[in-house]
């Protein structure tokens, strides 16, 4: 990083994407040494529950719902306490879901055992999670996170949607962070998409 900064100079941006889970934050980066050399860090605050997980959960929540659960706010709070300027911190949004099958209808499938099977992108939500196909939508107000459950198929899905992305954008503004990024643009809907939701909140402030 020192060599890159010397070559790039101060006018060119030098940044990187970092995992948003606590083990990575604790063990993988010497934050106090590298952040003075960097313009920003993009926190991948998604896949916090991923394809390796045998238990469902919010994969990109804004807030933790218990002491053990990872979240966007948990990562940001940790980095701010290290003294990293808020303007150098960028949070992440997921334009896709994580899904599991063989999930029991307890707590609407949330925090239950299951088998990960991937999940649809935001542009396909309206068809993939339709009521006619047996899906029900749920909002976790503590986590500020959306999820879906299909009792007939015993499937659970978690991901960002318009309400959760708006909540994240407001969080960025209120915390005076460096911004919000996402994976990835091609997964968004062409009309009334998640990027539109980010823009609406940003321009309304």
Where are these regions (language model features)?
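Active-site and adjacent substrate-binding regions of carbohydrate-active enzymes
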Residues: 1-20, 42, 156-205
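Glycan-binding loop/region signatures in secreted carbohydrate-active enzymes
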Residues: 49-51, 95-171, 197-205
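Substrate-binding surface in catalytic domains of secreted glycosidases
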Residues: 1-128
């Amino acid at each position: 990083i020192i060599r890159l900064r010397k070559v790039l100079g101060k006018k060119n941006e030098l940044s990187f994407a970092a995992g948003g889970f606590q083990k990575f934050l604790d063990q993988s980066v010497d934050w106090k040494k590298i952040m003075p050399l960097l313009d920003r860090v993009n926190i991948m605050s998604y896949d916090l529950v991923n394809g390796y997980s045998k238990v469902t959960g919010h994969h990109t929540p804004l807030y933790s719902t218990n002491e053990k659960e990872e979240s966007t706010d948990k990562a940001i709070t940790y980095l701010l306490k290290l003294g990293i300027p808020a303007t150098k911190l960028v949070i992440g949004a997921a334009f896709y879901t994580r899904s599991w099958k063989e999930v029991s209808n307890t707590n609407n499938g949330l925090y239950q055992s299951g088998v990960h099977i991937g999940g649809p992108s935001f542009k396909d939500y309206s068809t993939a999670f339709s009521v006619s196909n047996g899906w029900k939508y749920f909002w976790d107000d503590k986590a500020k996170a959306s999820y879906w459950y299909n009792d007939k198929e015993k499937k659970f899905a978690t991901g960002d949607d318009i309400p959760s992305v708006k909540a994240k954008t407001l969080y960025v503004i209120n915390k005076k962070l460096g911004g919000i990024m996402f994976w990835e643009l091609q997964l968004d809907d062409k009309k009334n998409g998640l990027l539109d939701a980010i823009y609406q909140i940003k321009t309304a402030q």
